[in-house]
Structure formats: C-alpha cells, structure tokens
C-alpha cells in the first residue's frame, strides 16, 4: 500500500496555447512531481550511514576489523509544502528534524534542494511574503521567524552566541511529594518533575548559525499564519490554540499589533485570505467565521457543523455510525479558495476524519453550504488550470484509514489516493475522469516507499491527523 499524499500544491500558467500546470505531492518523506506534458520525477532524501558507536576503532584493540552498521534511512516526513508566488521555488517543512527546505524547480519540473535549515523548535506553519524574499515560519511555542528564501553567504554564517559557562549541577529534589499535592494538575506537574530528574540534566541545544529574525510571539501554540498586502502596507495574520486571531504589521514592524479578531470559542486551526480581501477562519467551533479583518469586524458565521451533519445523513455508508447529538464536533483541517471565480469568493473546507469537502460562498450573505462526497478522508487540496477559463480540483485521499475514521484501517489496500472535480456551468461540482487519466502516473508515484502493512499505526496517524488534538479537554486545567 502506498503512503497517501499528506501535502499537495500546484502551479498553473495560462497562455494563448492553453494552460500548463505542475503538480507536487508529499508522500511521507518523498515529493512526487508531474507536469501537464507528462514529465514526472520523485525527490527523496538519501539514506544516511551511521557508524555504530560500539564498533568505534578508538575503543578496540589494534588489528581488529572495523565494522560498519547497516545503513539506516532516517525518515523525515513533510508536514507542509508552499510554492513561491513566481512558481520557481518550493518550500517544505519536515517535522521530525524541524527543517525548512527550499527547492528550486528546474525547466523539466525537477527539484533541486538549495538549502536545509533546522529550527530549534518544530515549525507549525509557513508562508511566503508577496515578493518571495522571505519565509515566515511559525512554531509550536508561539513565535514567528523570518528566514530569507535564498540566503546569502553572510546569512548562512551568522555568528553563533558564545556558549555560557557550565554551571555546577545540583541534585534536584522536588519540594512537593505525592502526599502533599491534591489537585490533578499539580500531581501531573510532580510526575513530570520526577521523570526529568530520572533523565538527568538536559543537554545544551546547538546554536542556530543561519539568519532567523524573530518577528512576533504569542503566549500559545501557533496553528496557522497568513501574509496580506494592501497597497504599500503588509500584514501578518496569526492564529493560535487559545482562540486568538492577531493582526500584526508586516516586516520590519511585525512587533506592532494592529488588533485582534475575537469571536472563536475553540482553537483556530486554519486561516484563508480571499482575493476579495475577506478572512475566513475555522477550527474547533461549529461555524466558519468571515471577517473584515482590517477593521476587526465579524461579517458572517457560516454553519459548518450543520452542513457536515446534513452530508453525513445523506450517505448510507456513514449514517448508521453517525449519532446526531450535542457531542458531535468538527475540527477544520483545511480552507481553500476556489480560483477562477470573479463574481464571488467560494471556499472549500475539510474537516479532520470526515469524507467530504464542504463549500460555501463568502461575503454574499448566503447561510447554507453544500458538500462534495469523497471516497475517503481528505488530506489536502490543489487546483490546476486546464484551460484559460476552467480549473480542476485535485483532492488527496487517505487510503490507509476507513472513510470517517482516523484510527480504523481499511481492509482494501488498493484505495484511491486522489479524486478530481471540475465546476460545471450550472455551478455544480462533478468528478473529472479526464484529469484522472492525465495524472495516472502521479497517482501511483512514491509507491516504492515503506510498507504500511508493517508500519506503526500511531506513527502513520500522527502524520495525517493532529488537528483534533488541539482541542482542550474538560478538566485539563484542574
């Protein structure tokens, strides 16, 4: 079974001769590429050889043969892919090593890695400024950094701070005991302190030696960010786990807060700035919120939960397992604006673990949404231009887990990894079999990866599903 595409992006270029496009998909630790002319390629990180410490020749008697361990391949799975606005560069984040990787896209749509910069904390979201000069990188500790897309030699040789003098380590003894703590929160804190004592003193972190400018910070985990430019003014919009949406000025004044968009009652996981200038946000709430973000005003509340329930009721394969009660909640995993629509702004929304896409017209006062039925849970969405006036939506499908589940595995190992939809003249969405034939090699790309039948189920799930984990549990602060 091939690993699904956890990330999808596409670039399109329209001309008098037609439309050309290139599709990029991250499947585990690989990036698969296919262009409209049929050229395809796969980028993968080379295996790393590791010298077994127990076979170090400095520890062995002279004359004993040195033995190298079998080469081990370290898997660094992509969590984000972003295309530059000019279509010449691809930026990806690999979570396990916390690295931001920049690729140049050549004339044959192949990828050449230009840089690999590992952050001190795992990035949670990235985007690019409109001039493609700067990568904005948000992390799980609430900070946003600016990295040059194409660093100069000086940027790569930033002087590391001098290491602090080692302090004498004192034996740590918690002031509390299991007999003196009474709340669940304090008990968990004590348990963590005892675990840390057993591990010993923490090792000092390696200093980052490339340019990374701290722009702003939240007191909560950052979940998404967006960049917007209006006239000669630029803005950085950030969202966090504590229901906040913050509007900050762009570089170099990102420390100045313009204001906040308050209205969410649960975590905010996704932001989408439409071409019409509206901000659409979603997360753990029952509604999508539409903002006049420059004035920090809430314009609309779109009924996401009700639209999802209506969709689930209409599907015989899901209605039996669905219980329409107050405990049903949604977690937004993606919001994408549909290109090519001039009159209004339409967005497609994915909810974690639900096999459908939910579309809404924003800024029109419409109160109802619609849905597209999928064969499995959606992971990402990309749009390719097939002619000067038409676009096709490509949806990455989880072919590992059953539709509607984030834990139960499929019995059929041959599930589709992609689905394709085109918008018709009447405004309805229809499956696009023609696009499926064009990207047939892409749909099979990266199938020489790890055997998922022997993979750790939790490891696979953690790569694909993590939004619902943002929800705060009752009693967590007790």
From Swiss-Prot:
Its main location: nucleus. SMART domains: WD40 (SM00320). WD repeats lie at residues 14-53, 73-113, 217-258, 263-301. It is found in: Nucleus. This is tRNA (guanine-N(7)-)-methyltransferase non-catalytic subunit TRM82. GO terms for cellular component: cytosol; nucleus; tRNA methyltransferase complex. The gene is TRM82. Pathway: tRNA modification; N(7)-methylguanine-tRNA biosynthesis. Belongs to the WD repeat TRM82 family. One of its GO terms (biological process) is tRNA modification. The keyword Ribonucleoprotein does not apply.
């Amino acid at each position: 079974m091939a690993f699904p595409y956890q990330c999808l992006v596409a670039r399109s270029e329209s001309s008098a001769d037609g439309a050309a496009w290139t599709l990029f998909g991250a499947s585990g630790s690989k990036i698969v590429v296919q262009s409209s002319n049929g050229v395809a390629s796969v980028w993968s990180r080379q295996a790393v050889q590791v010298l077994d410490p127990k076979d170090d020749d400095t520890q062995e008697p002279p004359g004993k043969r040195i033995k190298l361990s079998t080469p081990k391949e370290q898997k660094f799975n992509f969590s984000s892919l972003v295309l530059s606005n000019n279509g010449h560069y691809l930026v990806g984040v690999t979570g396990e090593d916390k690295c931001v990787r920049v690729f140049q896209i050549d004339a044959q749509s192949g990828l050449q890695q230009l840089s690999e910069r590992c952050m001190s904390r795992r990035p949670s979201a990235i985007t690019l400024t409109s001039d493609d000069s700067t990568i904005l990188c948000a992390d799980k500790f609430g900070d946003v950094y600016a990295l040059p897309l194409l660093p100069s030699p000086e940027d790569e040789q930033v002087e590391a701070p001098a290491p602090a003098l080692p302090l004498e380590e004192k034996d740590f003894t918690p002031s509390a005991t299991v007999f003196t703590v009474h709340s669940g929160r304090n008990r968990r804190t004590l348990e963590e302190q005892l675990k840390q004592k057993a591990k010993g003193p923490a090792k000092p972190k390696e200093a980052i030696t490339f340019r990374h400018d701290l722009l702003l910070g939240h007191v909560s985990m950052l979940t998404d960010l967006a960049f917007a430019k209006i006239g000669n003014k630029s803005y950085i919009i950030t969202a966090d786990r504590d229901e906040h949406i913050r509007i900050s000025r762009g570089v170099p004044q990102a420390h100045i807060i313009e204001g906040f968009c308050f209205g969410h009652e649960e975590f905010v996981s996704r932001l989408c700035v439409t071409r019409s200038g509206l901000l659409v946000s979603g997360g753990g709430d029952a509604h999508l919120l539409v903002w006049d973000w420059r004035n920090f005003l809430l314009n609309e509340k779109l009924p996401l939960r009700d639209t999802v329930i209506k969709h689930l009721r209409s599907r015989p394969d899901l209605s039996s397992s669905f219980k329409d009660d107050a405990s049903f909640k949604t977690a937004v995993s993606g919001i994408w604006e549909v290109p090519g629509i001039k009159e209004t702004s339409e967005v497609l929304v994915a909810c974690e673990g639900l096999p459908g896409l939910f579309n809404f017209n924003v800024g029109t006062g419409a109160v109802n949404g619609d849905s597209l039925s999928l064969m499995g849970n959606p992971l990402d969405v990309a749009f390719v231009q097939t002619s000067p006036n038409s676009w096709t939506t490509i949806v990455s499908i989880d072919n590992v887990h059953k539709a509607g589940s984030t834990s139960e595995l499929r019995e059929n190992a041959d599930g589709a990894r992609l689905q394709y939809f085109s918008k018709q003249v009447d405004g309805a969405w229809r499956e696009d079999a023609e696009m499926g034939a064009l990207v047939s090699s892409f749909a099979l790309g990266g199938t020489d990866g790890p055997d998922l039948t022997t993979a750790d189920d939790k490891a696979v799930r953690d790569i694909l599903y993590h939004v619902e984990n943002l929800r705060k549990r009752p009693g967590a602060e007790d």
